[in-house]
Amino acid sequence: MNELPKTMKGVWLTGHGELDKLDVRSDIPVPKPTADDVLIRVGAAAVNNTDINTRTAWYSKGDVTSKDASWAGKAIEFPCVQGIDVCGHIVAVGENVSKNRIGERVLVEPCLREVKGKALSKPCFLGSECDGGFAEFV
């Protein structure tokens, strides 16, 4: 396997608002998979209404200062990478994931209902409560 870069290109959302809150960058750190995770090289990502609604603070009725402008009802930490709909190839795996998964084509389920086998009180969504697919890796 080729060594992965330390940084990637992507689009950071820097706050709630219009398109001026999207910042195209080439210095976003590449995520490192933890023990139970995989790292995906993004092949394609679509703009979902969730991406737009999150950016414009629609979930908090347009109050851009609201602390509940996400699916989970908690404040979004900025900057973040949006992109709820994403597919690609697995390029790295955590220590608890079979290396046979590397190279596998995947379509990501964006709704996270559990983390490390424990149910979440509210679901979290890729590109909202955690970084999504508007970057080279997720």
Protein language model regions, located:
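Eukaryotic N-terminal low-complexity, Ser/Thr- and Lys/Arg-rich leader segments
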Residues: 1-8
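Short N-terminal binding/cap micro-motifs at the start of the first secondary-structure element
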Residues: 17-23, 49-50
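Glycine-rich beta-strand-centered segment in the early N-terminal region that forms part
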Residues: 29-46, 58-115
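Cytochrome P450 core scaffold surrounding the K-helix E-X-X-R motif
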Residues: 50-56, 117
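Short, Lys/Arg- and Gly-enriched loop/turn segments at beta-strand edges
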Residues: 113-123
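A structural motif shared across PLP-dependent enzymes of the aminotransferase-like
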Residues: 114, 128-138
